[in-house]
Amino acid sequence: MRRRRKKSCVISRKKFITKENPQTKPVLQATIEDAYNRLIAPAIEREVRNQLTEKAEDGAIKVFGKNLEQLLMQPPIAGQVVLGWDPAFRTGCKLAVVDATGKVLDTTVVYPTAPTNEKKIAAAKATVKDLIHKYGVTLISVGNGTASRESEQIIVEILKEIPEKVAYVITNEAGASVYSASKLATEEFPNFDVGQRSAASIARRVQDPLAELVKIDPKSIGVGQYQHDMNQKKLGEALGGVVEDCVNKVGVDLNTASASLLEYISGVSKVIAKKHRIIPRGERPFREQKRAPESGKTRTEGV
């Protein structure tokens, strides 16, 4: 860098000192060197660095957007009664059963992972078996966080001991803890604690990944590089656009859609989305477009 600056400074002297004057030449040379080394060169360096940083930032945001789109566009597993399993050690594994429309039917906590004993493991197995039998669970969705593998071992043992045909899947739980502590989750599940909300979210993610993930700030889903190193406004706008494109490309099911999902549909305002949310999930068998709240031709053409 110093060699480059010295070479540039020599070029500058030749450009500005056109006539040799032994009295003024040393002063002009010193002035040019000082101006270039102290002001001009650092300014150029900062500008180049900023341009490179901005270019790298744009590339990182594109990676964020591409990864987010792939996550949102995962195919849903519809028509399943799902047992959401939020694994943990000391605080226990939180369970939530949701029906085919995403309505939470039951929640509980079991302690099959360390520190534990045979008595607690047996009690946990009995609880899970009872939930499967009582609600007709057809799929278990296990979060991939802490104690995921230990929970998987217990689930495999349970499935071998019951006559029901139940499958299980490991689900990416990134952002579930952020959602469970959010204002939206508190409004949706006012009587549930953070763990129960997280288990319900893990269950719903396999039923309709897009509908569940739109409730979480895209920057918190963990689909790219360290997001705090980037321009937050630019990143937020880009990821918001990806979510909007995905929602409008796929459309929504009014029977299971939340207000958060409906807000991304073209022509649906937050007011209309909240009106829809007031209708309980169990009372939403919309089979005709005209039954939807505020359903005009223009209003629901993207739904």
List where the protein language model places each region.
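Phosphate- and other anionic-substrate recognition elements at nucleic-acid/protein interfaces
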Residues: 60-72, 78-81, 90-240
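Conserved helix-loop functional segments at active or binding sites
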Residues: 70-74, 130, 134, 212, ...
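Non-catalytic alpha-helical coupling and interface elements of nucleotide-dependent molecular machines
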Residues: 37, 41, 73, 156, ...
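Short, contiguous, well-ordered secondary-structure segments
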Residues: 65, 235-250, 272, 280
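Short hinge/gating elements
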Residues: 10-18, 46-55, 135-142, 184-192, ...
